[in-house]
From Swiss-Prot:
InterPro entries: Glyco_trans_2-like, Nucleotide-diphossugar_trans. GO terms for biological process: O antigen biosynthetic process. It catalyses: an N-acetyl-alpha-D-galactosaminyl derivative + UDP-alpha-D-galactose = a beta-D-galactosyl-(1->3)-N-acetyl-alpha-D-galactosaminyl derivative + UDP + H(+); alpha-D-GalNAc-(1->3)-alpha-D-GalNAc-di-trans,octa-cis-undecaprenyl diphosphate + UDP-alpha-D-galactose = beta-D-Gal-(1->3)-alpha-D-GalNAc-(1->3)-alpha-D-GalNAc-di-trans,octa-cis-undecaprenyl diphosphate + UDP + H(+). This is O-antigen biosynthesis glycosyltransferase WbnJ. It comes from Escherichia coli. Signal peptide: none annotated.
Amino acid sequence: MSLRILDMISVIMAVHRYDKYVDISIDSILNQTYSDFELIIIANGGDCFEIAKQLKHYTELDNRVKIYTLEIGQLSFALNYAVTKCKYSIIARMDSDDVSLPLRLEKQYMYMLQNDLEMVGTGIRLINENGEFIKELKYPNHNKINKILPFKNCFAHPTLMFKKDVILKQRGYCGGFNSEDYDLWLRILNECPNIRWDNLSECLLNYRIHNKSTQKSALAYYECASYSLREFLKKRTITNFLSCLYHFCKALIK
C-alpha cells in the first residue's frame, strides 16, 4: 500500500548523556520544514532521570515532544522501547549528537511516497566535535544495496526513515553495542529479500565523528562477523559464507 499524503511521522532519539550537542540535535528536528511529526526521546542509562529532567522544558515548549526514561543503557534496548511508544506507521531515526538539515524529513518522506519504499536513508556530511566539515559520504542506491550489504553497511543509521512494520516483523533491534543497525539490516535482507529500500544521494544530515567513535573498532567487526555467521548457518549460501569470511578477516586485521 502506498503512503498517504500528510502521514504523521514518529522521530526516535536516544539520549544517553546530556551534553552540548543534544539541544542542537533536538532543535534540528523541531525546525524541520515537514512539521507533522512526534519526537520520541528516550533518556537512557544510569542518569536517565536527570537527563529527562534537563530535557523537560521541550515538552512544555512543543507538544510534539515526548520524553521517556529507561535505565538500561544499551542503544538497541532504547530504540526498541522508542518503537513501542511510536503512534505512527512511519519512523525516522535521529542521534543525539547529529544535525538534521531542515529539509531532511520532507525530502525523505516525499521520496518514500513517490517510490513506494519501505525504508530510505540519505547521504551524510561528516563533521568533527567542533562542527567543522570533514567530507561527504554517499551510500549505494537500491540496485546495489542487496549485493553490497552482506559485506558492508549500506545505510547511515541516523538518516533512516522506515515503515514501522518492517522493524516489528524482525522483532526489532537485537544487536550488540556497536552495530545493532547492521544486524537488523542483515536479518531484513535474508528474511525479506524483496524489501523496497533505497538511499537518497543528497546529504541531509551532519554526522558527528568523535575521537572515541566506534566506527573503526575491532569489536564492531567481530560483531558483524558473528551476524554473518548466524545468517550463514540459517541460509548456507555462497554469499553468506563469503560475508562471514570477509568480516572475520577484517576483525583480525584490526
